[in-house]
């Protein structure tokens, strides 16, 4: 049985779109401070600080327990509801950040929201970041986090695998690695704006430039070079959009 794919779409009213324009401009100005055209050490540090600022714009929800621990040498954290729910399901959350930024502090906002929305325990982890640790370091770390859940007694079908942006890419690549190894896949995928194509061949960079303040061609080029310089961006471990063998449901929940 293949994992369930959940697609969430929300149409905005004209009033919401009108309000969104100044917000998008503000976000673009903030993000530009952390979206280097080249990946020097100074610019990379600036990008990571910017990512932390963006993550802290929304404080974690109350009613949560947050437990940090070491997972096979990397930092990880459980986010749980204070009120027990008794479920044996868990969410493995892969954070975004272009594979070059993001940490447990950044992850905490979305992991809290996922725990609150589902009632499930959420495991987040700090995978190694590029360019210090390029591909496949993040994939190896995601596999370690998956194996940790298996050792804790969770079944593959009990796991919801979630990821946003580069974390969505990582979630899909993890599924592909599990499938290739003949292992069971997670029961559900939750992908939020997943980065599925590193070839930069789509038209959305120009067609949606005014409403996407974050993902400029300069930013994408910088982070993909940091993560996988010299590699074939069409490969399945970099561009999951190329998958032909990882079959997802034909009737996903919307």
What are these regions (language model features)?
Residues 245-254:
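Single conserved hydrophobic/aromatic residue that forms the stacking wall/gate
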């Amino acid at each position: 049985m293949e994992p369930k794919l959940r697609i969430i779409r929300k149409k905005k009213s004209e009033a919401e779109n009108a309000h969104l324009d100044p917000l998008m401009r503000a976000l673009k100005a903030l993000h530009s401070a952390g979206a280097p055209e080249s990946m020097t050490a100074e610019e990379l540090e600036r990008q990571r600080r910017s990512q932390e600022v963006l993550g802290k714009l929304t404080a974690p929800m109350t009613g949560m327990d947050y437990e940090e621990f070491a997972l096979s040498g990397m930092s990880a954290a459980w986010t749980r509801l204070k009120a027990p729910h008794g479920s044996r399901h868990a969410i493995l959350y892969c954070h975004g950040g272009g594979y070059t930024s993001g940490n447990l502090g950044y992850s905490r906002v979305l992991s809290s929201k996922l725990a609150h929305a589902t009632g499930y325990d959420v495991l987040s982890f700090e995978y190694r970041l590029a360019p210090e640790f390029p591909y496949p370091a993040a994939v190896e770390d995601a596999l370690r986090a998956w194996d940790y859940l298996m050792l804790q007694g969770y079944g593959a079908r009990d796991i919801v695998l979630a990821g946003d942006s580069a974390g969505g890419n990582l979630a899909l690549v993890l599924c592909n690695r599990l499938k290739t190894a003949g292992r069971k896949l997670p029961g559900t995928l939750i992908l939020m704006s997943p980065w599925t194509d590193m070839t930069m061949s789509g038209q959305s960079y120009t067609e949606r430039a005014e409403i996407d303040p974050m993902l400029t061609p300069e930013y994408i080029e910088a982070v993909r070079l940091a993560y996988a310089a010299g590699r074939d961006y069409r490969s399945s471990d970099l561009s999951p959009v190329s998958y032909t063998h990882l079959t997802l449901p034909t009737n996903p929940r919307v």
